Structures are given as structure tokens and as C-alpha cells.
């Protein structure tokens, strides 16, 4: 019961104290408020009346010092003469699983605690001592009963400590913690009871390292937000000291226990010491512009002084200690990795026994029905051919019960053949996993922006004749004027890399353009696909155009062309829209926030849940996903040139001012400004599920952010003079995005509107934009023919030697163009992991410790209003998915669009909008 009251904001101590001359020594707040909210009830609540000093007899020892000279003491001296005790309730989160070493150290710490090597806390006032000019402090207090509770198995353990303070202490503003044990511990929160203003909350959520690793005391501040110029005098030095600790000095190799945030270039993706073929260019700098990543300080490689040495799995990559995954997240990710390893191992073994290519669609289907080992009944052959250790055999055989059996991707759930249809191919451009590339055709034929001296004529090979027969009676000009022509244009991003890509073993690609027509029903249909290769001489056929089929041969050609488009789309989705725009480009803002914004700063408190786990997942990506010979290189068409392609997109097209949803829709020609419409935009494709749902979330985020910002910045001068805020934004641009710092499109930060726009964009990218691009990867891409991540053969024409074999066995040629069994299984396992919500996911409209994350009751109330709006949006999306007039999300065999539904259960659900880029 006591714990429940503590979580609700009630004092733990209810007995009134009998203080000597309490009226003259304590000024009680008669109008103070203490916000009390059930974390599981999002209904707006009224604030309750204030809690006065609640100090029980057993905790209060009033020591009135009598005057010996008869002189009257000052009021300050009289207050200082009155001592009383207050209590801290300290919540520590236990690990669910410990290895042998951790268990031994835990027992040693329990013993050491008995003999005086304790956890020591010290309370610090918001006021300065008038004599010493230093912050007022309590006595040092020891955390009680650590040894006694060391065997407690509960997830959370509550300890207490007692402080002695005087009546002149003022309000608590900070608390220091010294860990004299050998083992770190996770400090979740501290609540102080006994002051007249009511309970004082310290939301900590941090690992506290042993004194032997980090000799300095840890500093935690209350949940009361302060702008820099409002910082109480007793906290100013501590505020700057804590920021200095987090910045470090830019030198040295980082230890896993460090809390230092700093910048570096992407020079750790290659492994030149292992092989020259694994050398990769440095990303970041004048030659190859790129955002900055978290600095680790590792030594350079032997063979390349500009390259940082690698940390290979299972060794962890450095991120600041509090950025590392929590235990349940680690377990979810580790399970996914095991599945990926086993899924990759079996096809690799199988490749030497049976053919590597799929024979037909049924063979792919059996991956979901039977699993890998059972699929062709070849498990006995593998175990005979490869004398594996018994433990490996047992593991593999046990795994066939589920781990090696793939879940059926959602794309097959309603109509397993829907993906073959042209209307579904087109629908996924606006309601699939990559709905952010489609653009309105403004000029036909399309025109390239590449240098014609290098890449040939800028005009497309597309002509009116190619598409006129598919425009439902419209002329091309009429279709343009009525906004009925749309396009996926991957010409300029792929063409500069094609010679190198097509020289790779088992990789073949085109630079594609796909033209869509918007029908009178509001659905899209593809009307032409242009396939381009780099020109190699005047007689070389570098461009060809395919149109919807008219016979069996053209049907197979058309299916192959759509597969090449989907492969282009998958590469740009992963390397540019997903990795670059929502992972890499956010990292500098996160690093700068920790370095420049105090935990007391209201903007840090706003951004905090939207930064969770991002540095860790980005570090893991550098280790195994985007690294040389990593998952992205092995699984996607661009291969070793994928990250260079990502860097080219950053240089040529990334603009922070265009990353917000409304600006992005306008830039792509998918919407026009219209003040009479909801959200101030008119969508030119009315049934555009990603944009329809995204605008609901964008507006909700924007309204919440505006309410928050206006609370702390009632006039623009406060923004201009906020040193921490300006330093954060400046460092994000000038250091984190240093290669683009001179661009004229960076928004200014001078007004409330400026700040609202910047923060809304960041929160949108971290939450809804990332969710729309990430959590459908397995549901849509887990069936590889729907979205092949790479292609292995070009499409033959009549002059090619392969044309005869294509005509004879088109299905065989089709599957030989697709990824192999080994490539497919590895890719499926990886995107399955990346599409998975962990049990500790925090979704938009949710926060840890929802009623105490800030001490501002008005803002807590506003946050619950925001959460209620998110709930209304979820119901609206469900309503839209049941509306038969919305043909792009409702109909026979049509998947509902749920990627922006805010909530989700754990697992692969194809829905859910987490607060942050956490996977």
C-alpha cells in the first residue's frame, strides 16, 4: 500500500510532527499542489490540494539550541539551529538474470555493505549557504538494508536513507550518489518525504558505477524543470559540472561504463586489417559528406591510420552506459540474432547438397509451413555430411520446433497471390513499407539531373506513345494537368553506381523509373517502367521501356521489371529513407542534446523519451548491418557501395527543413498548401494511407509541442537568450552535420514557431516516420518475391544469348534472378528481428513514470491530453481501415494500413509507433 501511495504521489509518512515553535521556523505552503495520477489512467485529472510537512515522531528530532548570551539571534541562525530528519525512498531495479561473476560480486557487495562500504547519498538545496556561498547540503546518508535485501528476487527493490537538515535548508534541488560497492546498479528513482512542500521526486533511470570505475559522485536533479537563467543559485555549479562530465574532453578510449557523448566520423565500417577487400571509405568530411556518429576513441587499424579498428560480435560497441539496451530489450534482440544465425547456417550447409535457387513458388511457401530443415527432408543428409558437435546438432534439431520456421508474412495473409497484381504493386507505393518516394510527375518525359557528359542524355526514353493507351481516355497533357501521373524515380541515385554494382558477383541492377496513373476510383496502376544502364558507346542500348503485358512473354518480362523496381525501392528504402533519414541524421541531435541540455532543461525532458535506445541500435548497425560484408552489403543490390549511395543521397537531397511531413509531401508534389483543408494541406491522392494517418499524428505532436514550448517560452527573447538551447541547436548543425553546416536551408532558432517546428520534426522522425518505415519490413518484405532486396540477372532481350533459355523456362529464369535460398533466409531472419517490438517498448503517448517525469503539474496534465488524442487517432485509423470507399486500405485481399496505429503488442505486428528509433 505504501508503494502504491508513493507511485501516486502521496507522502509515505502520515503522522504529524510536534515541532518546537514550528510556526516561527517553517513557512508552510498552504496553496502548493501535488499532482497525483494513476499511470494507467489517461483521463485528465484535477490537481489535488497541497501536502504540508508530514514528519512522524520517529523520524523527527528537533534540537533547539538555547541562547547562552541572551542576545537575539538572526532568523537564519534560528532556523539553522533547528534540525530535523527527512527520509528518502530509493528504488533500484534488479537484473532478472545474472551470470556467475555478477552473482559472486553481488554477494561480496552485500558483505562489504555490512562493514561500511555503502551506497552514500547527500541532499543538496536549491539555495546557497550565505556564509560559505556554497550549496547547502545535508549530512551524508547511507542506503539502509542493502545487505539484508541482496537476495530479493523482485524486479524493483525499495531502500531508505535518512538525512538531517536544518530549517533553513530550503527546497531540495539535487542529490549525489556514491557507489562504494564493486558492482554497478540501476537507480530508477528517489523520493524524499518530510519537507513542507510535499514529496520531492528524482526520476533517475541511470546506472550508477562503482567508485573504483568513476570516483566522482553522481548528480541527480529533481523533476522540476528550469531554463538556464532560472536555475536556483544552489544548482548552477552542479548544472554545468554535470554537462561537463557528459561532454568529456574528446580524448581517450571509451570504456563501456563511461557516460561521455562525443562526435566522430563513420570510419569504422571497414576492416582493412582483415582484408583489403573489406576497406571502406570514410563517411564524413569534404570528400564524402555524412552525419557524425558517437565517438568511441578506439585505436586506428594497422593498415589504414584513418580507419578505426573494429569491434566484432559478440563484443559490445561503446555507447554511453545509459544508452545501452535494458534487459528485456537485450533478450529480444539476442533471440532475433540467434534466429538469424541459425537461419543463415542451415541454407549455407544445404547449398552443397541441393540446388541453391528456389525451384518454384511452392518451395518458398514451404519455408513458412515446414521450416528450413524439414522443407525438403534433408536434415539427416546435413548431419551425415557435416560431423557437427552434438550440442550443435541438438540445438538445430530443437530449433526446428519453431525457431527455424518462419511466420507467414502479412502480405500473404489475405490473398497470397495479391502481390503479383499490378494494382497491389502500385498500392504499396502509397501504403506499403516505403510510401515516401512516390512523387507527382510535373514534366513528361522525366528529366535527369545527372551530368549528361558522363551519364548520357538527361531526357528519359519514355514517350507519350508508351503510356497513352493506359490513361483511361486522358491525353498525357490532360493527365498532367489533372494531377494523375505519379512516379517512383530511382534513376539518378542508382545510375552513378551501376557499373560497379553490376561488376559484383551475383548482382545485377537497373536504374528504374516507374510511371503510375491515378484512376477515377482513386487507385494507382503502373503504366510504364523504364530500365536504364550506363551508356557504353553510341550504339549501346542503355535505356529500355516496358509496358503492361499483352501476352505470356511480355507478362514474364513485366514481372521481372517490377521485381527490379522493387529491388531499387528496397535499397533506397533501407539505405536512405530508413537508415540515413531516421537513424543517422538523428544521432547528432541526440549527442548534442546530452552534451548541451541539462537534465533540468524543459526541452531535454520533452525530447528524452524520443532519444531512447537510438545510439545503441545505431552502434549495432555499424557493427553488423551497414559494415563491410555486413547484412546490408550481403542482402541488398548495392552491395559494398550501399553506404556510398546513402552518402550521395545525404549530399544531394537531405534537407532538415524538408523532413517534416507537410514539407515533404509538398516537395514531392503529393500535396499543395490549402488553408481551408485539415492540416492546411490538400492531398492530391485523397486516399494516401501513409499521408492520411501521418498528418493526424503530425498535428497531434505539433499541438503537444506548441503547448509545451509556450509554457516555458512566453516570449521569443527567452529562446534567443537560452544559452543551452542555442548551444544544442548550433552543435547539432555545426558539429553533428558539419559537412552541410553552410547550407542556407537550416531553419533559424529565434521564435516560438521556429522551436515548435524543429522539435516537432525531430519527434516525428523518431516516432511516426521511423515506425512507418521499419515495422512493416517483415510483413511486406518477408515474402521475398514481393520485395526482392537484390536481383542477380538482367532482363534478356531478343539479342541476348540468355533469351532462348528465358523463353523455354521463364519461371526458372525468374527464380535465378531472385536472391538465392541462403540470401533469402538470412534476409528474412534479419528483417524479422528488425520488425519486432520488444516487451519494454514505449509508444507515443506513453512515458516512464508518467505522473512524475516533470514537476510541472500543468505540463503533466497537458501530456495526458496528448495521450488521449493519440487514443482518438487510433480509433480513427481503425475506422478508416473498415471504410470500403478507401480502396487503398480496404477491400478483398487488401491489407489494412496499420503501420501508424499508435499501440502494439510485443512481436512482429505491422503496427505500433514507439517514441524513439529503438530498432
UniProtKB/Swiss-Prot annotation:
UniProt name for this protein: Lipoxygenase 3, chloroplastic
Keyword Transcription recorded: no
Cofactor note: Binds 1 Fe cation per subunit.
Chain ranges of the Lipoxygenase domain: 225-919
Annotated compartments: Plastid, Chloroplast
Keyword Transmembrane belongs to the record: no
Annotated EC: 1.13.11.12
Catalyzed chemical reaction(s): (9Z,12Z)-octadecadienoate + O2 = (13S)-hydroperoxy-(9Z,11E)-octadecadienoate; (9Z,12Z,15Z)-octadecatrienoate + O2 = (13S)-hydroperoxy-(9Z,11E,15Z)-octadecatrienoate
PANTHER family on file: LIPOXYGENASE
Recorded name of the encoding gene: LOX3
Keyword terms: Chloroplast, Dioxygenase, Fatty acid biosynthesis, Fatty acid metabolism, Iron, Lipid biosynthesis, Lipid metabolism, Metal-binding, Oxidoreductase, Oxylipin biosynthesis, Plastid, Transit peptide
Pfam families xrefs: Lipoxygenase, PLAT
Molecular function as annotated in GO: linoleate 13S-lipoxygenase activity; metal ion binding
GO cellular component: chloroplast
Pathway(s) where this gene product acts: Lipid metabolism; oxylipin biosynthesis
Swiss-Prot/TrEMBL cofactor(s): Fe cation
Family per record: Belongs to the lipoxygenase family.
Residue numbers spanned by region Disordered: 272-310
Induction line: Induced by methyl jasmonate (MeJA), bacterial pathogens (e.g. Pseudomonas syringae pv. tomato), high light and wounding.
Function: 13S-lipoxygenase that can use linolenic acid as substrates. Plant lipoxygenases may be involved in a number of diverse aspects of plant physiology including growth and development, pest resistance, and senescence or responses to wounding. Catalyzes the hydroperoxidation of lipids containing a cis,cis-1,4-pentadiene structure.
Tissue and organ distribution: Expressed in roots and leaves.
Domain PLAT positions: 86-222
Amino acid at each position: 500500500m505504501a508503494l502504491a501511495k508513493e507511485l501516486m504521489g502521496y507522502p509515505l509518512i502520515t503522522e504529524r510532527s510536534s515541532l518546537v515553535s514550528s510556526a516561527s521556523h517553517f513557512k508552510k505552503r498552504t496553496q502548493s499542489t501535488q499532482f497525483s495520477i494513476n499511470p494507467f489512467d489517461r483521463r485528465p485529472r484535477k490537481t489535488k490540494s497541497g501536502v504540508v510537512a508530514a514528519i512522524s515522531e520517529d523520524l523527527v528530532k528537533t534540537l533547539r539550541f538555547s541562547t547562552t548570551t541572551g542576545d537575539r539571534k538572526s532568523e537564519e541562525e534560528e532556523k539553522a539551529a533547528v534540525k530535523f530528519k527527512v527520509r528518502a525512498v530509493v528504488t533500484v531495479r534488479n537484473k532478472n538474470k545474472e551470470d556467475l561473476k555478477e552473482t559472486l560480486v553481488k554477494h561480496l557487495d552485500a558483505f562489504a555493505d555490512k562493514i561500511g562500504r555503502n551506497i552514500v547519498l547527500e541532499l543538496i538545496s536549491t539555495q546557497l549557504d550565505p556564509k560559505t556561498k556554497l550549496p547547502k547540503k545535508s549530512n551524508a546518508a547511507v542506503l539502509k538494508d542493502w545487505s539484508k535485501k541482496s537476495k530479493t528476487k523482485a524486479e524493483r527493490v525499495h531502500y531508505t536513507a535518512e538525512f538531517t537538515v536544518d530549517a533553513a535548508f530550503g527546497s531540495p534541488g539535487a542529490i549525489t550518489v556514491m557507489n562504494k560497492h564493486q558492482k554497478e546498479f540501476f537507480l530508477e528513482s528517489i523520493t524524499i518525504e518530510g519537507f513542507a512542500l510535499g514529496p520531492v521526486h528524482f526520476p533517475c533511470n541511470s546506472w550508477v558505477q562503482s567508485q573504483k570505475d568513476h570516483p566522482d559522485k553522481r548528480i541527480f536533479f529533481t523533476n522540476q524543470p528550469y531554463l538556464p537563467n532560472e536555475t536556483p543559485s544552489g544548482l548552477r555549479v552542479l548544472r554545468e559540472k554535470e554537462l561537463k562530465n557528459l561532454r568529456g574532453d574528446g580524448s581517450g578510449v571509451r570504456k563501456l561504463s563511461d557516460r561521455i557523448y562525443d562526435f566522430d566520423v563513420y570510419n569504422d565500417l571497414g576492416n582493412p586489417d582483415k582484408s583489403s577487400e573489406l576497406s571502406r571509405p570514410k563517411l564524413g568530411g569534404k570528400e564524402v559528406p555524412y552525419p557524425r556518429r558517437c565517438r568511441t576513441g578506439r585505436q586506428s587499424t594497422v593498415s589504414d591510420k584513418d580507419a578505426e579498428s573494429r569491434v566484432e560480435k559478440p563484443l559490445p560497441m561503446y555507447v554511453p552506459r545509459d544508452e545501452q539496451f535494458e534487459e528485456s530489450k537485450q533478450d529480444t534482440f539476442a533471440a532475433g540474432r540467434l534466429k538469424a544465425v541459425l537461419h543463415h547456417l542451415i541454407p549455407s550447409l544445404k547449398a552443397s547438397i541441393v540446388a541453391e535457387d528456389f525451384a518454384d513458388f511452392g518451395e518458398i511457401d514451404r519455408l513458412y509451413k515446414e521450416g528450413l530443415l524439414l522443407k525438403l527432408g534433408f536434415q539427416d543428409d546435413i548431419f551425415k555430411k557435416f560431423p557437427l558437435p552434438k550440442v550443435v546438432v541438438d540445438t538445430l534439431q530443437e530449433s526446428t520446433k519453431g525457431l527455424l520456421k518462419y511466420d507467414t508474412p502479412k502480405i500473404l495473409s489475405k490473398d497470397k497471390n495479391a502481390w503479383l497484381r499490378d494494382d497491389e504493386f502500385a498500392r504499396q507505393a502509397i501504403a506499403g513499407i516505403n510510401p515516401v518516394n512516390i512523387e507527382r510527375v510535373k514534366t513528361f518525359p522525366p528529366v535527369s539531373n545527372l551530368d549528361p557528359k558522363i551519364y548520357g542524355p538527361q531526357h528519359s526514353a519514355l514517350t507519350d506513345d508508351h503510356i497513352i493507351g493506359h490513361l483511361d481516355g486522358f491525353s498525357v497533357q490532360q493527365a498532367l494537368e489533372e494531377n494523375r501521373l505519379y512516379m517512383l524515380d530511382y534513376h539518378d541515385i542508382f545510375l552513378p553506381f551501376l557499373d560497379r554494382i553490376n561488376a559484383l558477383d551475383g548482382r545485377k541492377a537497373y536504374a528504374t523509373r516507374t510511371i503510375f496513373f491515378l484512376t477515377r476510383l482513386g487507385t494507382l496502376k503502373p503504366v510504364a517502367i523504364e530500365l536504364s544502364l550506363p551508356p557504353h558507346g553510341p550504339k549501346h542500348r542503355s535505356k529500355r521501356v516496358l509496358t503492361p503485358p499483352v501476352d505470356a512473354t511480355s507478362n514474364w518480362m513485366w514481372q521481372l521489371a517490377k521485381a527490379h523496381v522493387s529491388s531499387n525501392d528496397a535499397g533506397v528504402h533501407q539505405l536512405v529513407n530508413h537508415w540515413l533519414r531516421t537513424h543517422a541524421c538523428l544521432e547528432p541531435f541526440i549527442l548534442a542534446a546530452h552534451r548541451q541540455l541539462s537534465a533540468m532543461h524543459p526541452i531535454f525532458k520533452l525530447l528524452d523519451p524520443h532519444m531512447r535506445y537510438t545510439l545503441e541500435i545505431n552502434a549495432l548497425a555499424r557493427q553488423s548491418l551497414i559494415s563491410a560484408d555486413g547484412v546490408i552489403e550481403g542482402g541488398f543490390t548495392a552491395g559494398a557501395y550501399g553506404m556510398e549511395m546513402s552518402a550521395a543521397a545525404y549530399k544531394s537531397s537531405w534537407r532538415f527543413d524538408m523532413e517534416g511531413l507537410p514539407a515533404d509531401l509538398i516537395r514531392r508534389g503529393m500535396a499543395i498548401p490549402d488553408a481551408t483543408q485539415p492540416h492546411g494541406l490538400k492531398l492530391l491522392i485523397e486516399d494516401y494511407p501513409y499521408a492520411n494517418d501521418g498528418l493526424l499524428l503530425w498535428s497531434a505532436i505539433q499541438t503537444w509541442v506548441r503547448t509545451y514550448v509556450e509554457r516555458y517560452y512566453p516570449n521569443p527573447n527567452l529562446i534567443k537568450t537560452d544559452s543551452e538551447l542555442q548551444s544544442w541547436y548550433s552543435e547539432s548543425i555545426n558539429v553533428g552535420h558539419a559537412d552541410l553546416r553552410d547550407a542556407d536551408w537550416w531553419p533559424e532558432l529565434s521564435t516560438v514557431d521556429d522551436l515548435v517546428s524543429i522539435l516537432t520534426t525531430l519527434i516525428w522522425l523518431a516516432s511516426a516516420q521511423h515506425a512507418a518505415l521499419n515495422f512493416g519490413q517483415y510483413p511486406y518484405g518477408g515474402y521475398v518475391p514481393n520485395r526482392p532486396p537484390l536481383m542477380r540477372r538482367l532482363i534478356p532481350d531478343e539479342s541476348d544469348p540468355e533469351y532462348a533459355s528465358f523463353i523455354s523456362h521463364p519461371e526458372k529464369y525468374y527464380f535465378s534472378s531472385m536472391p538465392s535460398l541462403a540470401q533469402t533466409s538470412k534476409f528474412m531472419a534479419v528483417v524479422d528481428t528488425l520488425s519486432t517490438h520488444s516487451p519494454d517498448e514505449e509508444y507515443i503517448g506513453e512515458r516512464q513514470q508518467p505522473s512524475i517525469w516533470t514537476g510541472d503539474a500543468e505540463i503533466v496534465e497537458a501530456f495526458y491530453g496528448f495521450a488521449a488524442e493519440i487514443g482518438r487517432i487510433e480509433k480513427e485509423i481503425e475506422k478508416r481501415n473498415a471504410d470500403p470507399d478507401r480502396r487503398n486500405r480496404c477491400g478483398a485481399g487488401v491489407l489494412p494500413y496499420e503501420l501508424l496505429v499508435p499501440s502494439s503488442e510485443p512481436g512482429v505486428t505491422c503496427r505500433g509507433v514507439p517514441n524513439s528509433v529503438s530498432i
